[in-house]
Amino acid sequence: SSLRVRPGQAAVFLYQNKGTYDVITGPYDDVVRTENMPVLASIIGTAYKGGTPFPAEVYFINLSKGMELPFVIPFFRVIPSEPEYKAYDIEVAIKGAMTFEIPTRQEYLKYFLEAWGSSDTSMADFESKVKTLLTQEVKRVVSNAPKDTGIFIMHFNALIGELGRYICSRIQDPIAHRFGVFASGINIEDIRYDEESEGYQRLKRLTEDQTHLYNLENEKTALLGYEIQRQTMRT
């Protein structure tokens, strides 16, 4: 069979046992031959001058590295980590986008094909399914950030870049294991507090004269420490 794979695409050949596959990365415009596919060749050999017939499911995957999935998370509850302020929980809303890509490494393709292999998948299909998990994970990470890192809840906007990187490092595994995609970044566009709430008003009054007690550099280090640890583990 002839095969045309455009630049920025990959064709994944999934064989009958569903556990092995070959990947042809574009640009490619030629006849598919057994001899050009190492996994297939190891299964059935290279008989007939590389023209051995073989059954396989073929999936075309977008390899773009800058795909974005926007999200808007309505107000949800976040509790300060400081014991004296735990009574003053605050409602927080977040708007941003997840940047992602679809790697062709085996560990990602396994999850990707399990999640999406039963049918053609459009960007709309992807968004509708991933957004639910993405929202859950972002809420979980942000809700626990004060307790897990020591960041002061009123400093979220001052540390918006570091918070985005921290969120990304914490959601990468759940997103990959469920959908087979790599979350390469979380860009937070806006973080809003429910400034009309009693908890926000009281906490603001109690802490507005205590900003000297908090060190933003230490909080940045705490947020980025998890990301640095994960990068070290990958190398």
Give each language-model segment a name.
Residues 1-111, 116-120:
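Hydrophobic membrane-anchoring helix/hairpin
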Residues 64-235:
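Elongated, amphipathic alpha-helices that form coiled-coils and helical stalk/scaffold elements used
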